[in-house]
Amino acid sequence: MGFIDEVKLCLKAGDGGDGCASFRREKFVEFGGPNGGNGGKGGNIVFISDANLNTLLHFRYRRHIKADSGKNGAGRDRSGTAGKDVILKVPVGAQIIDEESEEIIVDLDKPGMEFQVAQGGKGGLGNTNFKSSTNKAPRHFTYGQPGEEKHVLLKLKVLSDVGIIGMPNAGKSKFLTRCSNSDTKVGDYPFTTVRPHLGMVKVDDSEVVIADIPGIITDAHLGVGLGHKFLKHIERCQILLHLIDVTHDDVVLAYSCIHNELELYNSDLVEKEEIVVLNKCDLLREAEILEKKNHLANYLNKEVLCLSINGDLQPILRLLSEKLKKSNSKEIDVYDPFKA
């Protein structure tokens, strides 16, 4: 299945139906009075977050979305029927952004959230509404109001507890494949992952959602490489699992490359909890591994873990689970109208 995480939409809510100017016409009733009905309300455009979706692919060929307009009123006090609402389902984690102002309209970060983005126009009034003691036969009616029109950007940010980051070919995909049921593509070449993958990991009595973020390279924040469009997915993660290929000539440089790109993209990302792991440790002698581990640990002033290609993952997974339980990570400042 394809993966699309950004799409522009043109939304047009339904127009309100026009009111009707009509008069009662019956035999032997010379002056029947007004009986024009009101116009129906235009349909709204509503977004709902659906936990069963994980891409915006279904909007690929549906960029212009229009709700039904309300029907016009009619004689005998018949009101027009309201236009049907358009319900658009999006994955959990989708943000709806006003294209012009670039402000976030809503952040649908929980399952089942519902938000009306474009409101249908009000229906016009029939001439019955204008009858009075001084005007018993009004011919006045009003037209329906136009529905809202909005140009929005849908942006999907993957929701996960842990984000696996690192340079291309650091072993991120294989780590996720081994510890979860995620069927990710694995190969010994850079950029194996070209879209974020999610995996569910059972750790003792808890479950951890882990995301494999595509490899990040120097100047990714400027659009270089495949990592650029996926940097935003890291914002949702509570903890970062930073994998570094131990065979890299300079493990400090490998770490700094990723760290700097995160900071340049969003400085809040480097404040997140991070576990650093030297991966593929079965490819070097123990003395070389120890030297690189100590070098990186001294640079970071914190513990660095080691992992072989087929090594036991449970210690790392348990550490992630424990940190998640204690985690009170700093959240990215996103306007949430549900909490406003």
Curated annotation (Swiss-Prot):
One of its GO terms (biological process) is ribosome biogenesis. GTP binds at residues 166-173, 191-195, 212-215, 279-282, 310-312. Residues 1-159 form the Obg domain. Pfam families: GTP1_OBG, MMR_HSR1. Keywords: Cytoplasm, GTP-binding, Hydrolase, Magnesium, Metal-binding, Nucleotide-binding. Mg(2+) binds at residues 173, 193. One of its GO terms (cellular component) is cytoplasm. The keyword Ligase does not apply. InterPro entries: G_OBG, GTP-bd, GTP-bd_Obg/CgtA, GTP1_OBG_dom, GTP1_OBG_dom_sf, OBG_GTPase, P-loop_NTPase. Its main location: cytoplasm. Residues 160-329 form the OBG-type G domain. Its cofactor is Mg(2+). It is found in: Cytoplasm. One of its GO terms (molecular function) is GTPase activity. PROSITE patterns: G_OBG, OBG. The keyword Metal-binding applies. Monomer. Belongs to the TRAFAC class OBG-HflX-like GTPase superfamily. OBG GTPase family. NCBIfam families: Obg_CgtA (TIGR02729), PRK12297.1 (NF008955), PRK12299.1 (NF008956). An essential GTPase which binds GTP, GDP and possibly (p)ppGpp with moderate affinity, with high nucleotide exchange rates and a fairly low GTP hydrolysis rate. Plays a role in control of the cell cycle, stress response, ribosome biogenesis and in those bacteria that undergo differentiation, in morphogenesis control. PANTHER family: DEVELOPMENTALLY REGULATED GTP-BINDING PROTEIN-RELATED, MITOCHONDRIAL RIBOSOME-ASSOCIATED GTPASE 2. This is GTPase Obg. The lineage of its organism: Bacteria, Pseudomonadati, Pseudomonadota, Alphaproteobacteria, Rickettsiales. The gene is obg.
